[in-house]
């Protein structure tokens, strides 16, 4: 079995931890990032910098043209990013329709071309309330499809799907990871806003771990 794996790497905390987890498991990681027109495109700069420092092969694929088909999200359209807790109903405005199915389909195709048997992404339990394409049942169904869609079966791996962001951070800190190398904020400004749901969940995870977030906030 090939040790090549594909990691969908946004540049955020969760995929950053998944990337390192796969590397420490001895996998030959190929990182894959997507420009889907997100306003927080700054995360891609963080992803590129980390992959360069680690010597990990990294592709950034521009699929921003899909926004002519699937607009209407605060992450991609001219809609204010909601503030408040990550699990509040208002955060549904940040859902990009069918995003993870699209990204995973592309990642699986890339995996097949690499003779890789696994694709990793950083879904976690905090995503379940708002993002249907981060729930276990979605991953199970995608794996059913990925097992028959190509001559080479590919398994979607979600090592943190039952864990909170707090637990992910706990694991990452135990590995000595530097989360100053990650970007979480949904706003694409120079500094993180500290008020959007993504920032609030990140700050909560650091507080729960008794740690200081190295990122600068407004």
UniProtKB/Swiss-Prot annotation:
Names of required cofactors: Zn(2+)
Residues that coordinate or bind ATP: 9-19
Binding site for Zn(2+): 185, 193, 196, 199
One Pfam family named in its UniProt record: QueC
Entry keyword annotation includes Manganese: no
Keyword field contains ATP-binding: yes
Name of the top EC class for this enzyme: ligase
UniProt cofactor note: Binds 1 zinc ion per subunit.
Signal peptide: none
Example GO BP: queuosine biosynthetic process
Function as written in the Swiss-Prot or TrEMBL entry: Catalyzes the ATP-dependent conversion of 7-carboxy-7-deazaguanine (CDG) to 7-cyano-7-deazaguanine (preQ(0)).
NCBIfam families registered for this protein in UniProt: 7-cyano-7-deazaguanine synthase QueC
UniProt record similarity statement: Belongs to the QueC family.
Name of this chain's protein: 7-cyano-7-deazaguanine synthase
